[in-house]
Amino acid sequence: MKSHTIEFTRDDLVVRITRYPAGEPGKSPSVEIEVESSGLPRSFVWFDREPQLFAFKEMLEEYIETFRPMKDETAL
């Protein structure tokens, strides 16, 4: 099985999510998330267990809810 990458782009923010196959039978696949933006240094997050993905999802939802009101205020 090959790796699979999905890329999302909005304004100057680029997010790439790459899923890598399990290296050995019985092992879980892993996920790498790469974020690029002109205002931030390039960063990577690597997950190799399902609970880590759930924690990241919760963190991402909280981030979106925190910054959505700020974006709406700057659009005025």
Give the ranges of each region predicted by the language model.
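Positively charged, low-complexity terminal tracts
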Residues: 1-76
